[in-house]
Curated annotation (Swiss-Prot):
Gene: Emp1
Taxonomic path: Eukaryota, Metazoa, Chordata, Craniata, Vertebrata
Pfam family, one: PMP22_Claudin
Name used for this protein in its record: Epithelial membrane protein 1
Biological processes per GO annotation: apoptotic process; bleb assembly
Key words of the record: Glycoprotein, Membrane, Transmembrane, Transmembrane helix
Membrane listed as a keyword: yes
Length: 160
């Protein structure tokens, strides 16, 4: 049981770090024809990330930014609650609070990435048709899966 909780803790920390990276880095869409990428915050061309997004004032990208920041916040809160419950909870109880907080993180990731996918993943406004998703987009979907698994495992596990 201790090994399972330690492994879950490590995966939770890795998920939080991946959420930070995927939200901060500007590689959500990558152009095939040039050294250019688009993130949640800026356009990057030739390694220079000074360009602002052409759609930066749209409500959809602001919603994606907000939900990704909320997912990071809920992931960290869930981690802190898990550590707190680990040392204060009585034996036999379940980690309901940390599990439900992690599932809220999962929901925020789902909403944020779904909005981005619908509005910008295949949009002609990013680049022309010769572009593909960057590692941040893929990393966010991986975090989506991990946060769901972690949330469910927190809900199922009992402290022994």
């Amino acid at each position: 049981m201790l090994v399972l909780l330690a492994g879950l803790f490590v995966v939770h920390i890795a998920t939080a770090i991946m959420l930070f990276v995927s939200t901060i880095a500007n590689v959500w869409m990558v152009a095939d024809y040039a050294n250019a990428s688009v993130g949640l915050w800026k356009n990057c061309t030739g390694g220079n990330c000074d360009g602002s997004l052409s759609y930066g004032n749209e409500d959809a990208i602001k919603a994606v930014q907000a939900f990704m920041i909320l997912s990071i916040i809920f992931s960290i809160i869930s981690l802190v609650v898990f550590v707190f419950q680990l040392f204060t909870m009585e034996k036999g109880n379940r980690f309901f609070l940390s599990g439900s907080t992690m599932l809220v993180c999962w929901l925020c990731i789902l909403v944020g990435v779904s909005i981005y996918t619908h509005h910008y993943a295949h949009s002609e406004g990013n680049f022309n048709s010769s572009s593909h998703q960057g590692y941040c987009f893929i990393l966010t979907w991986i975090c989506f899966c991990f946060s769901f698994i972690i949330g469910i495992l927190y809900m199922v596990l009992r402290k022994k």
